[in-house]
From Swiss-Prot:
Pathway assigned in UniProt: Cofactor biosynthesis; adenosylcobalamin biosynthesis; cob(II)yrinate a,c-diamide from sirohydrochlorin (anaerobic route): step 10/10
Protein name: Cobyrinate a,c-diamide synthase
Species of the source: Limosilactobacillus reuteri (strain DSM 20016) (Lactobacillus reuteri)
Keywords, alphabetical: ATP-binding, Cobalamin biosynthesis, Glutamine amidotransferase, Ligase, Magnesium, Nucleotide-binding
EC number of the protein: 6.3.5.11
UniProt cofactor(s): Mg(2+)
Family matches, as InterPro entries: CbiA/CobB_synth (IPR004484), Class_I_gatase-like (IPR029062), CobQ/CobB/MinD/ParA_Nub-bd_dom (IPR002586), GATase_3 (IPR011698), P-loop_NTPase (IPR027417)
Family: Belongs to the CobB/CbiA family.
Amino acid sequence: MKKVLIAGVTSGSGKTTAVLGILKALNEKYTIQSYKVGPDYVDTKFHTRITNRPTRNLDNYLVPDPQVLNYLFTANTENIDLGIIEGVMGLYDGLGTDKDAYSTASIAKQLNIPVILVINARATSTSAAAILKGFIDFDKKVPIKGVIINNVMSENHYKLIAGAIHRYLDLPILGYLPHDSTISLPSRQLGLVPDDELPNVDKKIAKVAEDVKAHVDLQKLLSLATSVSEKVVDPFNIPKTRLRLGIAKDKAFNFYYADNIHLLEKTGIELIPFSPISDNHLPDVDALYFGGGYPEEFASRLAANEFLKKEVYEFSQANKPIYAECGGLMYLGKVLKQGENEFPMVGIFDGMSEMTPRLKRFGYCEAYTQVDCMLGNRGQKIVGHEFHHSMFKQLDQQLKPVLLMKKVRDNQIVDTWSGGYQIRKTFASYLHVHFYQNPKLFIQFLNNLGADVQ
């Protein structure tokens, strides 16, 4: 497999647009595995829509062991021609001010992936060359090999910028993408609106692909891609087990890392999908798994499905294991509030999720278990990330948080809070967790779900 990383100078540079167009243009001829740097769930779905292959996240905060991350990058790539990695934010943006703290640049260096920068050309000409020179000089170990100029207003505008880059830099220009307001993808509180909620998304992607074919030198891009080194042996040697795990999968619940799903299945877990929106009954399973998503967008339909809410509540009452992240916590609470509207949810946890106009939590965080719970025994450290526009409030003060949360930036604790709740064998929190962070932690998690892994 050849590999190449598309990174932005800043957020909003157009890297997602460029990646979607490149994926669509090359997918007609090549077998492509796409990746996304960082913890994002939504962009990956757009990739998968094009490639028909689960997109994988590359995150060296959530997966701190370099050998494990290298394995996740190279696994199952025997029949792949090209790996295309989309960066996150700007190239050097990560956690705090350290350019190597979980940034796209740190991934490029760690996995030795050549970088193609995307720069927004709006209202600039020669200054684009200065910006690019700054990016190249800022860290010479980052293999920046080319640039795509986005949001170009005219052919003359492109020639002006390209001329400046050629004059001051020895950096290949792969081409440009013209300004086109009709191809922009709408956003909401957690980033882009998911692809399956956009009726014209395929037309927009096709239009970007046409622009890529017309104005970007794809052969030059392919020539800059380098080969992946030999495959890494899976460092997670988890014994096989057997368990039927019901997994909530519909428009309200769909935030799952492809590698988490793969690891569960590889361990012998049988995943049985069900829809909290439309199914009247739970499948015959040993445990339940609710990922994140957008329950607030489908609150009325979730609230109206009394049959399934009752079965989920009774599942918990029967002391069967339930694990829930973010949107799953909102669903398992008593009420989901949006403005003046209150929607009754499952009611396992006597608390209310209330939507807020601004992000309440955003980014990487550390969780420390205060009691034995689904995620681990007391005193266990778990890394993850939170990203939500809601707050969960206990309606009964007997409901106590089981996690102490910390945000650490530049080696300083900048925020602490409490979160996560467990009643019987039901656990829910706002924390999103990557299962590949710690094999012992994962084995303990499986056993808490009801598996028997020694």
